[in-house]
Amino acid sequence: MLFHFLQAGLRQCRPPARLVGLETGLSGARGPSLPATLANYSRLRNACRPPWRSPWKPVKKGKLLAVLLGPAVLGVGVRAARCQVELIAPPLIVPQGARPEPEFNWAEFWKLLRPQLIALLTAVLLAFGAALLNIRIPLMLGELVNVVSRYTREHAGNYLQEVQGPALKLLCLYGAQGLLTCGYIVLLSRVGERVAGSMRKSLFFSLLRQDVAFFDAEKTGLLVNRLTSDVQEFKSSFKQVISQGLRSLTQTVGCFLSLYYISPKLTGLLLVVMPVLVGSGALIGSFLRKLSRRAQEQVARATGLADEALGNVRTVKAFAMESREMELYSAEVDKSSGQNEVLGVGIAVFQGLSNVVLNCIVLGTIFAGGSLMSSKELSAGELMSFLVASQTVQRSMANMSVLFGQVVRGLSAGGRVFEFMSLEPTIPLSGGFKLPVLRGEIHFKDVSFSYPTRPGHEVLRSFDLRIPHGKTVALVGQSGGGKSTVAALLERFYDPTEGAVQLDGVDIRILDPSWLRGEVIGFINQEPVLFGTTIIENIRFGRPDATDAEVHEAAIQANADSFIRSFPEGYNTMLGERGVTLSGGQKQRVAIARALLKDPKILILDEATSALDTESERAVQVALDRARSGRTVLVIAHRLSTISEADFIVVLSKGQVAEFGTHQDLLRRGGLYADLIRRQNQESQEAQ
């Protein structure tokens, strides 16, 4: 029993904060008039930017829910949600930098639990009934032992007839307890799975709603860990606390009353010994927790090394560094094994001592009980009942000590999940104005911008650019000059720090983001990401309702139809993860087909051919030239040879427009663009 008290160690953490969004969109296209909308927007844009996350506020419903969940939860309190309890557990993925431990959101939990409340209450009643039967069982055993003892001593009467009554009662108790246990486990399993499923769905939807700035600041591994490990941890804790916590607490209280009823003297001796043992266990446990923490940190280092090596396995193989990575990982694993072995020895020694002490308690109970029997203060059956009830108390208290740690771990895991479920994006997913007539004219009006992760570094400074509808404008410049940032602002992945991005004279911050990205803009970047499904489903990604004929037409326009049909499965060919089974040029053309299927009015080409070989570049360039027809096109170029036919070329330098004009005009000026052309030609000649 005392071994389990080791698992209740607390680490104080700071409260979290939540992401708070500023609602700038409208409810739909039928909202206020455009002038009124612009007036509302002008007031909003001058408001202070909201903090990254809002403070947590306690909810009265949460306190009521804590009562419903049983006294086992109440013993932890609200602060327990900010603690981490664990002796031996897998390492959690933690982002760099200090991160405050989030509070458990009882209000959100209540929303998830409310649909399952009837099943939960039924399970609680069944668990309570099973606990009451467990209290009654030691007393019935005592009656049975008294019958056997009396018959052994007196040899009078019919043994089978006398033992039949207590035995049948005990058998009925066992059967009823088994049925109640089966019932509450089934119900709790259903409640736990449904709550966990709803939690995962809500969390995943919340993550998808977040803007790009959120994913710049958070690691993907951390988010996946929230969806998997944290939800699983919370579900397991929830089910165990309800099933085991209520039963253990009821059994402890009930059996203590039974012990006092059977023998107040023996109960008093037990109450004297128990606090001493618990205190000793807590002292030794603090030492073992330090060993455990070091072992966990070492496991985390080994896991991080393996994750990095496997995530970059192509680079590892490209440099033939498999043996070096194996040596590094083996060294970390050996350190982890050594620390865990030391921890295991400590646990083994303590467990052995605990067993000796607990058995001595049993022996002492028999000795003291025998003395009471000799003075006729206790019968054999009562001593048997006392022993069984005391063992039940020990098991229940040990179980509660484990559950205490499980409660804290579960609340901590749930708090981390609810932290992201409660986030509101600064840029809403939908809602806002939709232009009834779209021409496709773009205006970056005195735009300044800094990434949220680098607030002190301006990527764009007073950037001003007007792109007429139906024209192709190319952005060129050195790496880090802000070219891709311009495309990100047009897609409204971010909002400008200053200035505005306008579409047909309307600030895109009052437009519906889902309409803007889903129908107006087609985006093709340097490294297109495909999904591990069929080619036809990848092309349909932007328009799930598109017919096969429309998909085939988009593929023809993207110069992809011929190579797709050359595969044995054609359009139904399954692609590997991220489309690794296709070449770079093939992936790019599938991405172009995906963008063209939406028939966007605006097309963004972010260095779409820079990573391709000459032959693939030629095939993709033909598709891109075809895609530009009748659309406003923003080209972010690395290879300057691909943009000579653009209507206008913009040279970016230090976040500002340095030069603007046609290819021939800029060459004649002999400025930055001409210098870029000259250097690229020189590099090309040297490469040959």
UniProtKB/Swiss-Prot annotation:
ABC transporter domain sequence ranges: 442-679
Protein's UniProt keywords contain Transferase: no
A Pfam family: ABC_tran
InterPro entries, per the entry: AAA+_ATPase, ABC1_TM_dom, ABC1_TM_sf, ABC_transporter-like_ATP-bd, ABC_transporter-like_CS, P-loop_NTPase, Type_1_exporter
UniProt cross-references to CDD domains, sorted A to Z: ABC_6TM_ABCB8_like, ABC_MTABC3_MDL1_MDL2
Subunit structure of this chain's protein: Component of the mitochondrial potassium channel (mitoK(ATP)).
Protein's job: ATP-binding subunit of the mitochondrial ATP-gated potassium channel (mitoK(ATP)). Together with pore-forming subunit CCDC51/MITOK of the mitoK(ATP) channel, mediates ATP-dependent potassium currents across the mitochondrial inner membrane. An increase in ATP intracellular levels closes the channel, inhibiting K(+) transport, whereas a decrease in ATP levels enhances K(+) uptake in the mitochondrial matrix. Plays a role in mitochondrial iron transport.
PANTHER family: ATP-DEPENDENT PERMEASE MDL1, MITOCHONDRIAL, MITOCHONDRIAL POTASSIUM CHANNEL ATP-BINDING SUBUNIT
Protein name: Mitochondrial potassium channel ATP-binding subunit
Organism of derivation: Xenopus tropicalis (Western clawed frog)
Upper taxonomic lineage: Eukaryota, Metazoa, Chordata, Craniata, Vertebrata
